[in-house]
């Protein structure tokens, strides 16, 4: 069967701190084109690789990877909220297959996800509940982090499993590219924030969540005025990364350490490993070709914003 892939940056700042209208129109046009290609492909199953931002995963237990056998989106920053339509038996079978391949994949029957999962489902499929989905969390902010090699191997294992299903499979990668928004770090946290990072942040009071979101919005507004206030975006790195993906050279990223990536492009750039997993997964279906490449640094969203598709040729 055929597979399709789309990788897309996300940002909680969409609708809160937007770029100029012509830039917004350009991005919306790119997303609309991707949505049309996906609709024409008519996926029967979605595999969504996405990170979390201390909304569902915390330091009480922080796996490098987790497959949601059941998952609910919390609706942060106005994103879609509700249950994801996870096919339970298929998710369980996927977990067993990945474990048998040598990848230690955690599972959750009550996974809580945020805008990192919700935005691609909203933007590209029209909602959370349009197509059965296997949601796969890849830790992109909480050290210690998985590396490129292990993430690639995860994607390959999931790709091999889904290639046996006789279904049209859509792989989505959500996140990146270069960026470093204000995300708390356990080593630097005060007592209150440490408690939140250790797990109490899963059920934040509405007032505290609003303050947290406002801090991110304020940081974006300052970044637009002075891009020295946060780690700068890195368009050169972002475009080199996208070229590696298009050329099927993702294995070369194995040599890039987590420390190097943080220094080059920002501490939240590790979200690009969702793209690596997606491209590794589609490779299990045979030959593919990329299409629809788009990139633009968007300070208002604190992101090097990228969009890239691929389709199998067999």
From Swiss-Prot:
<keyword id="KW-0408">Iron</keyword>
<dbReference type="Pfam" id="PF02900">
    <property type="entry name" value="LigB"/>
</dbReference>
<keyword id="KW-0058">Aromatic hydrocarbons catabolism</keyword>
<comment type="function">
    <text>Catalyzes the non-heme iron(II)-dependent oxidative cleavage of 2,3-dihydroxyphenylpropionic acid and 2,3-dihydroxicinnamic acid into 2-hydroxy-6-ketononadienedioate and 2-hydroxy-6-ketononatrienedioate, respectively.</text>
</comment>
<dbReference type="InterPro" id="IPR004183">
    <property type="entry name" value="Xdiol_dOase_suB"/>
</dbReference>
<keyword id="KW-0560">Oxidoreductase</keyword>
<protein>
    <recommendedName>
        <fullName>2,3-dihydroxyphenylpropionate/2,3-dihydroxicinnamic acid 1,2-dioxygenase</fullName>
        <ecNumber>1.13.11.16</ecNumber>
    </recommendedName>
</protein>
<feature type="active site" description="Proton donor">
    <location>
        <position position="115"/>
    </location>
</feature>
<feature type="active site" description="Proton acceptor">
    <location>
        <position position="179"/>
    </location>
</feature>
<dbReference type="GO" id="GO:0046271">
    <property type="term" value="P:phenylpropanoid catabolic process"/>
</dbReference>
<dbReference type="InterPro" id="IPR023789">
    <property type="entry name" value="DHPP/DHXA_dioxygenase"/>
</dbReference>
<comment type="subunit">
    <text>Homotetramer.</text>
</comment>
<comment type="similarity">
    <text>Belongs to the LigB/MhpB extradiol dioxygenase family.</text>
</comment>
<comment type="pathway">
    <text>Aromatic compound metabolism; 3-phenylpropanoate degradation.</text>
</comment>
<dbReference type="GO" id="GO:0008198">
    <property type="term" value="F:ferrous iron binding"/>
</dbReference>
<keyword id="KW-0223">Dioxygenase</keyword>
<dbReference type="GO" id="GO:0019380">
    <property type="term" value="P:3-phenylpropionate catabolic process"/>
</dbReference>
<dbReference type="GO" id="GO:0047070">
    <property type="term" value="F:3-carboxyethylcatechol 2,3-dioxygenase activity"/>
</dbReference>
<dbReference type="GO" id="GO:0019622">
    <property type="term" value="P:3-(3-hydroxy)phenylpropionate catabolic process"/>
</dbReference>
